[in-house]
């Protein structure tokens, strides 16, 4: 993907469907933030009666044949002294949605006068690029004729030296290839995005990037490894499970190794503990954790980061037939720990448990970070805009929080309340797979933590149940799959581990 281009001169810009002009909100007036303002002043001056330039405000007007663009987007950046990275991100995302609805495919973007910016030009460009890329995506609709708005095909950023801008553009484009991969997988039909499909995606990535290797465990290999929890969840499906291990070695001589684990339930019926029909409608997205870790590896491989990262994906359906695993039964995982099934709809933690054990046995991890659409309790707690996370390591938690703030992908650390472990007590097994009807996100995290078995490895669990999928178009995300977490984790890996 090469969408963005840069040009130092505004006067030599190419013709385009539209131009984006930035504006500051002053005390008693509106001021165009770009030096090119005079060329269009007679046109936009009339529109300023209804345009206050408050942060994220957008207005579309026509150029009436004046200049090299057919339309002009007035983009409000608010008060200069209050400008934040997130406001830049959301403002250009909003402008992108407006342009696409107007059927524009090419756009010239005029930067504010650099000396007036309160954030660095690198920060401004990064968030401008991310904002546009986030909404330059189409959900794969299955209608006979496409009803999607056209995508932007060329974005020409004016008033910046290419040497500075192009590096940022290529980096963000590579990251968003990973975001789009995540979205495509989550949005795909469950009958198409099967465990084997995820395995094939991983194989394709290993072929594309020389620094990657892949290992796929089929059903027989899963049983041979005694992954009794993953095997139990898979019993009710006509589709065989897969266990995917995709390794990126960007620094082979280093012993530092990050393992990312993604829940890969490609469709979750709830099993014999059947979900209500309405709750099942979005359950093709229950593999968003798997899609996220594959998207992250795509991004770090494209950026050629000097790190060692392995993505592990336990992939299966949670379906129903006569052989489906049953409530009240006990199954033993790869760790040797036994689990009484209190609910067949608490399957995600079971397959993650075997993945954690595999990582500890074979990967020698420095840290493990898992991603899962794990609990409805997290959605109730934090909604769609914030993902809750748990960690046994304060440094890891702080670094993830910083990455969250820098990328505007909100994470909130929640407590691992050891007292709540008693909710997982079983009289006949080492534990149950579900607690009481309270603190469900915490007890799910405590369940996973048990499978670390006190080994000295840093661990974080990200419950993305609320953030992975959107019911409607939002400021930064299109409807349906969001790709949440890919940008945050790539930032974390690049800043804190690429040394």
From Swiss-Prot:
Amino acids binding Mn(2+) 2: 263, 268, 286, 347
- E.C. numbers: 3.4.11.1, 3.4.11.10
Which Pfam families did the record assign? Peptidase_M17, Peptidase_M17_N
> Per the entry, which co-factors are needed?
Mn(2+)
Give this protein's Gene Ontology molecular function annotations: manganese ion binding; metalloaminopeptidase activity
GO biological processes: proteolysis
The EC category is: hydrolase
Subcellular localization, as worded in the UniProt entry = Cytoplasm
Q: Which GO terms describe its cellular component?
A: cytoplasm
Primary site of residence: cytoplasm
Keyword set for this entry? Aminopeptidase, Cytoplasm, Hydrolase, Manganese, Metal-binding, Protease
Q: How is the cofactor bound?
A: Binds 2 manganese ions per subunit.
Record's catalysed reaction(s): Release of an N-terminal amino acid, Xaa-|-Yaa-, in which Xaa is preferably Leu, but may be other amino acids including Pro although not Arg or Lys, and Yaa may be Pro. Amino acid amides and methyl esters are also readily hydrolyzed, but rates on arylamides are exceedingly low; Release of an N-terminal amino acid, preferentially leucine, but not glutamic or aspartic acids
Record-listed Mn(2+) 1 binding positions: 268, 345, 347
Q: Which InterPro entries match?
A: Leucine_aapep/pepB (IPR011356), Macro_dom-like (IPR043472), Peptidase_M17_C (IPR000819), Peptidase_M17_leu_NH2_pept (IPR023042), Peptidase_M17_N (IPR008283)
The active-site annotation reads 275, 349
Protein family:
Belongs to the peptidase M17 family.
Write down the HAMAP family for this protein, in alphabetical order. Cytosol_peptidase_M17
What is this protein's function per UniProt? Presumably involved in the processing and regular turnover of intracellular proteins. Catalyzes the removal of unsubstituted N-terminal amino acids from various peptides.
The protein depicted here goes by the name Probable cytosol aminopeptidase
Q: Which gene encodes it?
A: pepA
């Amino acid at each position: 993907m090469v969408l963005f281009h840069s040009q130092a001169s505004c006067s030599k810009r190419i013709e385009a469907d539209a131009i984006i002009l930035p504006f500051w909100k002053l005390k008693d007036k509106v001021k165009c933030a770009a030096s090119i303002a005079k060329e269009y002043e007679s046109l936009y001056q009339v529109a300023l009666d209804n345009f206050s330039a408050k942060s994220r405000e957008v207005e579309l007007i026509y150029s009436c044949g004046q200049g090299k663009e057919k339309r002009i987007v007035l983009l409000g950046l608010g008060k200069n002294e209050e400008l934040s990275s997130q406001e830049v991100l959301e403002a250009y995302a909003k402008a992108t949605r407006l342009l696409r609805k107007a059927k524009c495919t090419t756009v010239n973007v005029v930067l504010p006068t650099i000396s007036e910016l309160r954030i660095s030009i690198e920060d401004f460009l990064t968030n401008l690029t991310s904002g546009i890329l986030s909404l330059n995506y189409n959900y794969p609709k299955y209608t006979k004729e496409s009803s999607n708005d056209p995508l932007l095909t060329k974005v020409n950023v004016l008033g910046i030296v290419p040497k500075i801008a192009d590096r940022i553009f290529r980096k963000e484009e590579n990251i968003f290839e990973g975001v789009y991969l995540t979205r495509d997988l989550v949005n795909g039909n469950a009958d198409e995005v099967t465990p084997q499909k995820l395995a094939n995606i991983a194989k394709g990535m290993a072929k594309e990037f020389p620094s990657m290797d892949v290992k796929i465990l089929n059903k027989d290999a899963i049983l041979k490894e005694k992954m009794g929890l993953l095997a139990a969840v898979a019993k009710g499906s006509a589709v065989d499970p897969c266990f995917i291990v995709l390794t990126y070695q960007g620094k082979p001589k280093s012993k530092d190794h990050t393992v990312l684990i993604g829940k890969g339930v490609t469709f979750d019926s709830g099993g014999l503990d059947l979900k209500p029909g309405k709750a099942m409608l979005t359950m093709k997205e229950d593999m968003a954790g798997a899609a996220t870790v594959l998207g992250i590896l795509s991004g770090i491989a494209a950026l050629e980061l000097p790190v060692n990262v392995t993505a592990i994906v336990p992939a299966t359906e949670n379906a129903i037939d006569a052989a489906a695993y049953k409530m009240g039964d006990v199954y033993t995982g790869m760790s040797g720990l036994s689990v009484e099934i209190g609910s067949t709809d608490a399957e995600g933690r079971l397959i993650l448990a075997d993945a954690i054990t595999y990582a500890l046995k074979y990967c020698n991890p420095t840290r493990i970070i898992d991603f899962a659409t794990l609990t409805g309790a997290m959605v109730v707690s934090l909604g769609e805009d914030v993902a809750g996370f748990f960690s046994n390591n304060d440094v890891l938690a702080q670094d993830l929080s910083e990455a969250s703030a820098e990328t505007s992908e909100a994470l909130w650390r929640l407590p691992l309340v050891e007292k709540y472990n008693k909710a997982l007590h079983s009289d006949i097994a080492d534990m149950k797979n579900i607690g009481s009807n309270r603190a469900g996100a915490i007890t799910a995290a405590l369940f996973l933590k048990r499978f670390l078995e006190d080994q000295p490895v840093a661990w974080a669990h990200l419950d993305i149940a609320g953030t992975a999928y959107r019911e409607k178009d939002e400021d930064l995300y299109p409807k349906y799959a969001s790709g949440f977490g890919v940008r945050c984790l790539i930032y974390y890996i690049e800043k804190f581990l690429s040394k």
